């Protein structure tokens, strides 16, 4: 069973003006597809092509670096499309909102900490909000296509991701050029907090 490109849950232009249609078209149809093609090549003839991608990543230290890079790329982008929405809200509600306030002091303080992690990630990578094994919310950034599920990230950064932001240049350069902070600020307008809340509940 080969891995395949998931369909976007919205049109390429649906996130404008925050994320432009051309970026979405290239990011989803070209970059994400390339990770899938390379992942399928890396797992061909092994038992990995029958495993869920999350299960592979939890033990990714056992596999070739191509599985880490391209498996991470596939998982991360599939995750990213799901936590974006044209109907982005002002912020989280319910238990996830309470957990964010309890951990970070306020939603605004959380946004500042998350945005700082995304802004200061040197080179390519991701910023994450994740549920640690003690059920506490934490923020980290990871290089390349790593994520908190992987057993190759530092122990203190391991857990279940519930919100992520791609800060590779291909995610924003067409529209924002070198203005990464503007892209990060725009991201908050298209976060699907209902999806984040659902993933939070699943991670507990």
What label would you give each PLM region?
Residues 1-204:
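Feature for soluble, non-membrane regions of globular proteins
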């Amino acid at each position: 069973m080969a891995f395949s490109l998931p369909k976007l849950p919205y049109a390429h232009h649906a996130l404008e003006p925050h994320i432009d249609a051309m970026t979405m078209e290239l990011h989803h149809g070209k970059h994400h597809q390339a990770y899938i093609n390379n992942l399928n090549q890396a797992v061909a003839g092994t038992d990995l092509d029958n495993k869920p991608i999350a299960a592979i990543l939890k033990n990714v230290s056992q596999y070739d670096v191509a599985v880490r890079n391209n498996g991470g790329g596939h998982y991360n982008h599939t995750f990213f499309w799901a936590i974006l929405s044209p109907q982005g809200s002002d912020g989280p509600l319910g238990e996830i909102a309470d957990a964010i306030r309890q951990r970070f002091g306020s939603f605004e303080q959380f946004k500042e900490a998350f945005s700082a992690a995304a802004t200061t990630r040197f080179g390519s990578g991701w910023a994450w909000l994740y549920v640690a094994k003690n059920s506490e919310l934490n923020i980290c950034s990871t290089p390349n296509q790593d994520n908190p599920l992987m057993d190759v990230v530092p122990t203190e950064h391991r857990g279940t991701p519930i919100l992520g932001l791609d800060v590779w240049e291909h995610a924003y350069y067409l529209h924002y050029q070198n203005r990464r902070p503007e892209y990060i600020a725009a991201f908050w307008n298209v976060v699907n907090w209902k999806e984040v809340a659902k993933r939070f509940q699943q991670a507990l």
